[in-house]
Amino acid sequence: MKPLSSPLQQYWQTVVERLPEPLAEESLSAQAKSVLTFSDFVQDSVIAHPEWLTELESQPPQADEWQHYAAWLQEALCNVSDEAGLMRELRLFRRRIMVRIAWAQTLALVTEESILQQLSYLAETLIVAARDWLYDACCREWGTPCNAQGEAQPLLILGMGKLGGGELNFSSDIDLIFAWPEHGCTQGGRRELDNAQFFTRMGQRLIKVLDQPTQDGFVYRVDMRLRPFGESGPLVLSFAALEDYYQEQGRDWERYAMVKARIMGDSEGVYANELRAMLRPFVFRRYIDFSVIQSLRNMKGMIAREVRRRGLTDNIKLGAGGIREIEFIVQVFQLIRGGREPSLQSRSLLPTLSAIAELHLLSENDAEQLRVAYLFLRRLENLLQSINDEQTQTLPSDELNRARLAWAMDFADWPQLTGALTAHMTNVRRVFNELIGDDESETQEESLSEQWRELWQDALQEDDTTPVLAHLSEDDRKQVLTLIADFRKELDKRTIGPRGRQVLDHLMPHLLSDVCAREDAAVTLSRITALLVGIVTRTTYLELLSEFPAALKHLISLCAASPMIASQLARYPLLLDELLDPNTLYQPTATDAYRDELRQYLLRVPEDDEEQQLEALRQFKQAQLLRIAAADIAGTLPVMKVSDHLTWLAEAMIDAVVQQAWVQMVARYGKPNHLNEREGRGFAVVGYGKLGGWELGYSSDLDLIFLHDCPMDAMTDGEREIDGRQFYLRLAQRIMHLFSTRTSSGILYEVDARLRPSGAAGMLVTSAEAFADYQKNEAWTWEHQALVRARVVYGDPQLTAHFDAVRREIMTLPREGKTLQTEVREMREKMRAHLGNKHRDRFDIKADEGGITDIEFITQYLVLRYAHEKPKLTRWSDNVRILELLAQNDIMEEQEAMALTRAYTTLRDELHHLALQELPGHVSEDCFTAERELVRASWQKWLVEE
């Protein structure tokens, strides 16, 4: 045995001072002194358990002792009665055996291949023992999971990565995938669980038993992220679910990972053979598959970027010529030719490397250089980790640990060790570059593009730095990285084929480049990723955004400006087609052309296909709404025009809905026979409120009432004859149904018909005579106020003229000023008590004092008060033109009318913009103080003082 170097002999004196009495210096062998000097982990362990050192001295580690691990552990567990005891014994056993492995490794008592085998089998032994103990415990608690035939179902565990390959390093995570064979339920328990529940609960307990730190440490850090759908997927999957996933969605990196997958424990059972046979076609293709080279090149590029980004210098695993590159070289041949060459299907690297040489896929010299380099690097890695049982592959910077490694690797000093290391890594790098290729030199533009790809593909952590986000604040940068990470997790839950992922990988760097250049990058990205989640399984939409950069830019600018638009696009991705043509996107349909446009749009849908008709109506409305909002955001539509467009659009929809309902009712019952004596349909739709006043907002509902002029004795003329008035009732019900039916494109409009005579208690459709009688003899003042903002939005000329005459007659009735003033004011106070002042320190733009409703009440009061003297006041139903009429007819001073108009349009404009932001209609208390003061003064003047 090589004597300790001078620095290590000096350090031995420090070790001596730590040793307890049973471990006196004179009682220790030279081997013990060497190992205790080299490894703080061994030192701490034998100080806590001196008997372990005695055992090591009397029974030194052997190369084949891994064959006894299972029996030794079973003996340790035989008296364990609870989970806490299980956790304790597993941790102590792991530590005891790791001390033996560290001893053998430090003194080179066994080969490096034996060390890797012992480390891997120790992990497998601990995992299987924990699984079997917990399976028995869970079966006692919940019953035994069985398939439909009553056969017990086991939990199979795939060990991935180095664990699967039998090449585990000294201090390592373990990558696992859990699976069970067939669906069914537990039998014999206190209550029945389905197998998915049983194995999920058991899997959670198994992870806890292995992973949770206690005063005895942990067994292994467990990583389950290699399972289908990653962290967002089920913890345990049935064989059928595994097969579906890998057949439909398995990605190249998952093939790469699955090469090393090994079933832990009994790997020759029926279910183990079934699982292996199921996975083999996914991993090893029957044809020679050269596409894998580019996939591995991409993965290596990601790793290289991570090394640069995280400053991982001196990393013997990830650095150029490191362990990972040897693994890549070997797996290139496995993935390209493994389906044809069974000798390449080994999970372990060294046997596969020998097979590669025998098949003359690499020269004997290259294969030998890789073998020697691999064993050198793995010994160096394991020695490095065994110093403190620490998961690291970065060479130390301190003198003590450098001296330790130089001595254990059998070099005189650190420079000699690093010289040999450099030679090995240079050999590896040469073979890697010849086989897989290195990144070619990039232009500045290509480098920038690469950085955006890195941002998308490399799953950066919050504390990672990347130059493309340097202009953002720290909070925004972290938020952007979190959004990207969350989006990627969400993608793992979705069924996205290879083509979809390919398109996404092309689209996302461009999208991130455009979004992250904005100051509001985080907010915009949050809206767009929410939208993308809804369309990732529909490759056509991804291709649209990928292939039409202008459409992508429009999408970004609209989503940045309005979460309402982002939500609409997310709910109804068909609207993405609208982004293709900026000429139509930012130019809404002419106000008088909506009916014609809709008629043309509906021609593409069969008249007898009601479902498609409903969808078409909704899709047309959403597309037009998007155009109006886009023009609003672009500033090409002032507030009055926005409402005009929204109102004309609603009228076109009403027209089409009545037409559809009419056709359906006539086909069923025929037409009411009184129509034989007159033109038209004898039916009208009256719009109240915002619709009647040309003041619709983006999310306004429609206040409608339905009128007819059908005589009492009229009947329909169809084969299924019904009463004429019954026909109009069913027509109105059908209209309500067409508006409110929820399809995949949502509803058309919320419709409120409670303003009809007698409200919700009244008939849904009213005869024109009954309506007139009600307004004259029963209606309340507030119903006459509502009539000020009412107009026919659909109807034949005869009924329209009748309604207009009734409206004019009611509004021009002489009214006693004080009584009217009191009734209007009291109604407003009731509304304010019910709707206003709900938000402390906020101003509700519509409902609070000085807001929009006050202006509406002022105009309604003045029309009802003075229309009997000035009948022209009844001409218009919208507030702005009523204010003009009040000024023109010398009821209100022009200056006041103009000021109220400005206040009204300003407040309405703010409501539109809040709707675009999906924000409620209230603002800070100190907003719009001038407008509110003006409205209060006008209210005082007309409704209090007069």
UniProtKB/Swiss-Prot annotation:
The lineage of its organism: Bacteria, Pseudomonadati, Pseudomonadota, Gammaproteobacteria, Enterobacterales. Residues 1-440 are annotated as: Adenylyl removase. Its EC number is 2.7.7.89, 2.7.7.42. The gene is glnE. Belongs to the GlnE family. One of its GO terms (biological process) is regulation of L-glutamine biosynthetic process. This is Bifunctional glutamine synthetase adenylyltransferase/adenylyl-removing enzyme. NCBIfam families: PRK11072.1 (NF008292). The adenylation activity is stimulated by glutamine and PII (GlnB), and inhibited by 2-oxoglutarate. Deadenylation activity is stimulated by PII-UMP (GlnB-UMP) and 2-oxoglutarate, and inhibited by glutamine. Involved in the regulation of glutamine synthetase GlnA, a key enzyme in the process to assimilate ammonia. When cellular nitrogen levels are high, the C-terminal adenylyl transferase inactivates GlnA by covalent transfer of an adenylyl group from ATP to 'Tyr-398' of GlnA, thus reducing its activity. Conversely, when nitrogen levels are low, the N-terminal adenylyl removase (AR) activates GlnA by removing the adenylyl group by phosphorolysis, increasing its activity. The regulatory region of GlnE binds the signal transduction protein PII (GlnB) which indicates the nitrogen status of the cell.
